[in-house]
């Protein structure tokens, strides 16, 4: 079992191979549901080590941050202790929200990556327009966390769908 720091280092290696400068890992599934997602979609938790339902992780070449809200500060402090992941306390003074952070920290002519299946089209369009001003691009076709997770990733839910 890899440590959080080892998983982040592997993600950084994949980012470098793909030419990605900053990688965004939201907590959503492919239906854009943020809470109560199947284990398969718990990429934020797998990479950061934080098991709380709300939040996202952002990784750059020299920074890894977990954004979450006040309901989870104590839990996050405990679960991130001893890792390279910095707790970013949402709605606290001096903490930039994730989307502006992505825009501000994608370098000129750089590349922001994320799994396009778990980010809303409105966020992707907004990011694309903002990054265009920096001559930067989006890379949305690869789920790099899947590669890091490998064969140990839980399988997609296979239960039958039914009408309530």
Describe the residue ranges of each PLM region.
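N-terminal accessory/capping or targeting/presequence segment of soluble
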Residues: 2-107, 111, 115, 119-164
């Amino acid at each position: 079992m890899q440590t959080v720091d080892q998983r982040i280092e592997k993600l950084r290696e994949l980012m470098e191979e793909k030419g990605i400068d900053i990688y965004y890992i939201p907590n959503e599934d492919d239906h854009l549901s943020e809470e109560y997602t199947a284990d398969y979609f718990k990429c934020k938790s797998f990479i950061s080590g934080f098991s709380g339902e709300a939040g996202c992780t952002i990784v750059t070449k020299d920074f890894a941050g977990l954004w979450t809200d006040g309901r989870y500060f104590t839990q996050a402090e405990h679960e991130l202790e001893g890792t390279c992941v910095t707790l970013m306390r949402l709605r606290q003074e001096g903490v930039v929200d994730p989307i502006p952070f992505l825009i501000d920290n994608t370098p000129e002519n750089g590349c922001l990556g994320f799994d396009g299946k778990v980010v809303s089209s409105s966020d992707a369009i907004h990011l694309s327009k903002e990054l265009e001003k920096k001559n930067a691009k989006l890379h949305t076709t690869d789920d790099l966390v899947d590669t890091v997770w490998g064969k140990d990733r839980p399988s997609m839910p296979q239960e039958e769908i039914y009408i309530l």
